[in-house]
């Protein structure tokens, strides 16, 4: 069964795309970030946007899929949780059809982004640095779910999607990561 879903953000969303520059620093190489000018806060944030070549913002489909999987922690099938720390039943019965989910401003228009600057803790060192990331205050998206109804009924998938928006969230500093950003509500639900 195909379900067309429309979501609207109830809190701003913060993006933090993993760039090639980040990969170099993680794998032990050197990068411009380590050895030279980092650029303006806006230039730093611009590199972290999920945006296509025309500059249109999007949410990666795998991010929405991971959000659904993590929402499974709040649901049980029989005596077992749908998602545990090591496994989940969600991938066997639900998929997000789009690889790239275009964002809107929640009203059908193009979303605008601002620079969100705040300190972050580097887990490996415990040190603090300033991080400049893109923040979209008004946002929404439309995507499709392919659901195996032998595994999951549409009303269960709706509860899962509602919990994903309230308790898990999307992108950086979301509720699942002890933050307030990336929360959403389902505003459209069409079963085909």
Per-segment meaning from a language model:
Residues 1-192:
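RNA-interacting cores
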